[in-house]
Regions:
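A C-terminal cap/extension of S-adenosyl-L-methionine-dependent methyltransferases
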Residues: 64, 68, 73-129
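Phosphate/oxyanion-binding loops and surfaces in catalytic or ligand/nucleic-acid-binding neighborhoods
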Residues: 11, 25, 68-72
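Acceptor-substrate binding/catalytic loop of class I
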Residues: 22, 42-61
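A short glycine-rich, Lys/Arg-flanked "PGG" loop and its adjoining helix->strand segment in the class I
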Residues: 2-17
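Short glycine/proline- and charge-enriched loop/turn segments
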Residues: 37-47, 93-94
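Short, glycine/charged-enriched secondary-structure capping and boundary segments
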Residues: 3-6, 33-36, 91
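Residues in well-ordered alpha-helical elements
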Residues: 2, 60-63
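Conserved class I S-adenosyl-L-methionine
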Residues: 17-42
Length: 129
């Protein structure tokens, strides 16, 4: 993480913006990304190892890491499926080969929840100080 953030800092000019989309370190996030998306043969849609528990970060941890590299975290919002059952439906269809990755978002209908507490994934942006 530190190497990536340092490279982002070097690439940005003062006031430049870094947008991010990442996975939280909650129990639910681990279950979804490490078990459902990577571990269970029935629902595996990502190669094992794409996500590792050691690389998951909560919003507070990420904010601290951004600050260490001269990036001020400006906003974080929850990003989730409107209906979790639609995510399961899309994952199973993707696993069967019935749909492509590009067809997942309209099926799942992801929504941003600006004031929500991110349980699984979250979006945000930081600005170079």
């Amino acid at each position: 993480l530190d190497l990536v953030l340092e490279q982002a800092r070097l690439a940005l000019r003062p006031g430049g913006v870094l947008f991010y989309d990442t996975v939280n370190r909650t129990l639910l996030a681990r279950l979804v990304y490490l078990v459902v998306f990577q571990g269970l043969p029935l629902t595996r849609i990502m190669p094992p190892g794409r996500y590792a528990a050691s690389r998951l970060r909560g919003p507070g941890e990420l904010g601290e890491a951004l600050a260490r590299h001269g990036l001020r975290n400006e906003d974080v919002c929850d990003f989730k499926p409107r209906n979790p059952a639609s995510l399961l439906k899309a994952v199973l269809a993707r696993r069967r080969g019935a749909i492509t990755d590009e067809q997942i978002p309209p099926i799942v209908d992801f929504v941003r929840v600006p004031d929500g507490s991110p349980l699984v994934t979250y979006l945000g942006y930081a600005r170079k100080v």
